[in-house]
């Protein structure tokens, strides 16, 4: 399954594309940060980010678009920008008939690190391990978008048997968390995510 993750932001919008396989391994396809100038008119900024997201969607043809769920912040202008870009992303996905997954930051952190309060460096470190990258993805918008894609792919994989393909191509000499996960049931991070999901359902 190909997932396109979006870390929404008006100045910097991270977009990460990941292939997730039936053995829960994952492969990096692409990662970009769509940028706009803070001095530009709002409608031009929204159009620029929307065009950037849609260009990547059309290029990579994902099955699912995963977007960070908006949550309250002290900085009203920041949360408004995030909400506006989220709307742009959702419209683009709907226009193409794509499934959408919304995840809170704590859900994503729990999925990839096993800890819902992990900091950005911990998230980036685990994303690099899962994808078998030689360096941490930067900036944080990029690693957050990839983490969203991984989280959505693992959730889809645990909700139905088999995702796209059987096993990711092997990268010689690169150790990753996915290697230990292959064929061995949920990883520790996935198990933590499942526990968090069950706890959330219990509070509803």
UniProtKB/Swiss-Prot annotation:
Residues of the signal peptide: none
Cofactor(s) needed by this chain: Mg(2+)
UniProt KW Calcium keyword: no
Active site as annotated: 7, 68, 141
GO molecular function: crossover junction DNA endonuclease activity; DNA binding; magnesium ion binding
Predominant localisation class: cytoplasm
EC number(s) reported in the record: 3.1.21.10
GO cellular component: cytoplasm; Holliday junction resolvase complex
Annotated compartments: Cytoplasm
Reactions performed catalytically: Endonucleolytic cleavage at a junction such as a reciprocal single-stranded crossover between two homologous DNA duplexes (Holliday junction)
Key words, A-Z: Cytoplasm, DNA damage, DNA recombination, DNA repair, DNA-binding, Endonuclease, Hydrolase, Magnesium, Metal-binding, Nuclease
Residues the entry annotates as binding Mg(2+) 2: 68
Residues binding Mg(2+) 1: 7, 141
Any one biological process term the GO annotation gives: DNA recombination
Cofactor note (record): Binds 2 Mg(2+) ion per subunit.
Similarity remark: Belongs to the RuvC family.
Oligomeric and partner information: Homodimer which binds Holliday junction (HJ) DNA. The HJ becomes 2-fold symmetrical on binding to RuvC with unstacked arms; it has a different conformation from HJ DNA in complex with RuvA. In the full resolvosome a probable DNA-RuvA(4)-RuvB(12)-RuvC(2) complex forms which resolves the HJ.
Free-text function comment from the UniProt entry: The RuvA-RuvB-RuvC complex processes Holliday junction (HJ) DNA during genetic recombination and DNA repair. Endonuclease that resolves HJ intermediates. Cleaves cruciform DNA by making single-stranded nicks across the HJ at symmetrical positions within the homologous arms, yielding a 5'-phosphate and a 3'-hydroxyl group; requires a central core of homology in the junction. The consensus cleavage sequence is 5'-(A/T)TT(C/G)-3'. Cleavage occurs on the 3'-side of the TT dinucleotide at the point of strand exchange.
Record protein name field: Crossover junction endodeoxyribonuclease RuvC
Record gene name: ruvC
